[in-house]
């Protein structure tokens, strides 16, 4: 985002210094507590997600180097492949993840980790909780994700995504 009231930097070095100053200022003045009610739930290709930290959407927090989101798995997530480097803490429920064809069961209190590996990790998450959706928090350290050339390839969308967006799957 460009602030038209500010003077453009004279060169790349000055632009880098200005960027560092903005990062430091955001660390001093950005939100320390992100309230649940301040972030909306969204229906995405992966399912129902609420982002708490996401620099692409929210520049109001003291930390910008992390992508942190809560996901609710009602039946199953979308299937996709990307570089790993993701830690997922299970908040409620139980289920399993199929990663590169192998099943990994999880439940409340577990930590699911997707490794960084050549070619990425193909995975999909499933809820087996008969009492309702499973829910977790996912943590992605963005500098690492960018360094390993993060790329997401969607293989299947979560149930209900097309209907939520008014799309037709034909």
Regions found by a protein language model. Name each.
Residues 67, 110, 123-125:
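Hydrophobic/aromatic beta-strand elements that line small-molecule binding cavities or substrate pockets
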Residues 76-82, 105, 124-128:
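Short histidine-centered beta-strand/loop micro-motifs
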